[in-house]
Structure formats: structure tokens, C-alpha cells
């Protein structure tokens, strides 16, 4: 599907910002200049700029214009706004990656597992333990649960590559959304077995429930990250405070 005009402007400006065409702290071209360049309406330009504000690339300054505030994400950053496979994250951050499947089995969700993962009791599941290496060093230990009826052909060999690539390109599943929780937890025996924690006694844990386009939760994953490489980075926008009159 062709991109709408505001999306074309958004991506064009985003690429320029990331390439350093506009200095950090400097102003982007004015609305009138962008209207002339892209042959569009003022509302279209403003919609594109609003998306850049939302994504943390620019900030509007009343009476001045639109200011570039983009800072490149460090390679250790874990971003929350997108759903990425481990291999995709490694490519984005310029690191070499490898995945080892240290356990590949099946199980059925009982009440305890249902409460922990969100799968209904009785759901037939694949259960995997995987170790993700970055630049040859084990950095992430995963507990993966996948619905077997959503991917009956999953194998250990596939799991050593990219499961998401298999789901999207072979199963033709559309992966839509993921609910995530980040906690800090004490290191367990398996963490110490598979990750080189040294003097660290805790790690960052990202628990995610991922859904496909049919609204089916097909995956629950608990990713246990080495503290030295985990850094949460997101972009938050404060909405205007409600006045007392507006609260009435």
C-alpha cells in the first residue's frame, strides 16, 4: 500500500535528521518551505511533524519553529516502541549475534503456568530455553512459550535462527502487538549457568505477551538480560494538565 503524503514527509525528514543534515539544537525548515518542497497542505506538514515530535526526533518551540532534538540510540538500548526479533535488534545495533537452543520441549498449560503466562489452561505449548550471544558473549537468556496450534512445524533448527522470520515468511502470520513488563529480579541458577554474571546478583527481565492479527496470544517470553548491556530507552510526551474547570 502506498504511503500517505504525511508519511512520505515524515520518513524523508526522519532520514535527514538521522543522517545529520540538521544539527542538534538547530531548526528544521519552516512550514512554508516544507509545503513548497513537498507540494502539500499545511495540515499535511503538521501531521508529519507531529509524528516526529511523538517519536522524539523534534520539539516545537513557540515563536521559533521546530527544533531537532534527536540523539542516536546507543547500541545497548532496548527500545519499547517496536516488536523486533533478537537478530533484527543485533543488526540495528551493528552487533554479531548467535542463538543457542539449550532446551526444546512441549508442555500443557496448567493453572500455575496459565497465571504466569496468560495462556488458557489446557493450551498445548512449545517450551524453549534459548541463549542469545552478542559479539560472542552470552547476554540474554530466554524462556519462550509458543502455542503449538499456531506453529505446528516449529523445530529446534528453526528456533536457532529467527522464529519471527519463520512465522512471517513461512507460516504467513501477521505479528501485531506485544504487552511488556520490565522488572529487576535476583539471578537464578539457570541465569548463572548460561550468562557470565560475575559479581552481578540481579538482571533485567522483560516479560512479553505477543498477539497476531487474529487477536490470538501466540507467545509468552521472559527475556533475562545481562545488566551490563540492558538500557531502557523510550520517548514520553507529557499531555497538557487538566485545569480545575475542565475537571468539573
Model-derived features: where do they sit?
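Extended, compositionally biased flexible segments
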Residues: 53, 59-60, 71, 84-87, ...
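C-terminal all-alpha effector/ligand-binding and dimerization domain
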Residues: 97-248
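Beta-hairpin "wing" of winged helix-turn-helix
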Residues: 22-25, 54-63, 69
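A generic "binding-loop/recognition-motif" signal
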Residues: 64, 86, 163
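Extreme N-terminal segment that seeds HTH/winged-HTH DNA-binding domains in transcriptional regulators
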Residues: 1-42, 248
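Short, hydrophobic-biased segments on the C-terminal half of alpha helices
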Residues: 49-50
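Short, cationic-aromatic polyanion-contact patches
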Residues: 4-6, 30, 67-82
Amino acid at each position: 500500500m502506498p504511503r500517505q503524503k504525511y508519511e512520505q514527509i515524515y520518513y524523508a525528514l526522519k532520514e535527514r535528521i538521522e543522517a545529520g543534515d540538521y544539527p542538534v539544537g538547530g531548526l528544521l525548515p519552516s512550514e512554508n518551505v516544507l509545503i513548497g518542497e513537498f507540494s502539500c497542505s499545511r495540515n499535511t506538514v503538521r501531521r508529519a511533524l507531529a509524528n516526529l515530535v511523538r517519536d522524539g526526533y523534534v520539539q516545537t518551540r513557540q515563536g521559533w519553529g521546530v527544533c531537532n532534538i534527536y540523539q542516536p540510540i546507543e547500541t545497548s538500548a532496548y527500545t519499547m516502541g517496536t516488536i523486533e526479533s533478537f537478530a533484527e535488534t543485533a543488526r540495528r545495533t551493528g552487533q554479531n549475534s548467535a542463538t543457542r537452543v539449550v532446551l526444546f520441549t512441549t508442555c500443557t498449560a496448567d493453572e500455575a503456568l496459565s497465571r504466569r503466562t496468560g495462556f488458557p489452561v489446557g493450551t498445548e505449548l512449545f517450551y524453549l530455553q534459548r541463549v542469545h550471544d552478542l559479539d560472542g558473549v552470552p547476554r540474554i537468556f530466554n524462556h519462550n512459550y509458543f502455542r503449538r496450534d499456531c506453529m505446528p512445524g516449529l523445530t529446534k533448527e528453526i528456533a536457532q535462527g529467527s522464529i519471527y522470520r519463520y512465522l512471517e515468511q513461512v507460516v504467513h502470520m501477521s505479528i501485531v502487538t506485544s504487552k511488556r513488563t520490565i522488572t529487576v529480579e535476583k539471578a537464578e541458577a539457570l541465569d548463572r549457568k548460561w550468562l557470565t554474571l560475575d559479581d552481578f546478583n540481579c538482571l533485567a527481565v522483560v516479560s512479553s505477551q505477543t498477539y497476531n492479527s487474529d487477536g490470538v496470544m501466540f507467545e509468552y517470553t521472559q527475556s533475562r538480560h545481562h545488566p551490563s548491556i540492558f538500557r531502557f530507552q523510550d520517548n514520553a510526551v507529557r499531555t497538557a494538565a487538566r485545569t480545575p474547570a475542565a475537571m468539573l
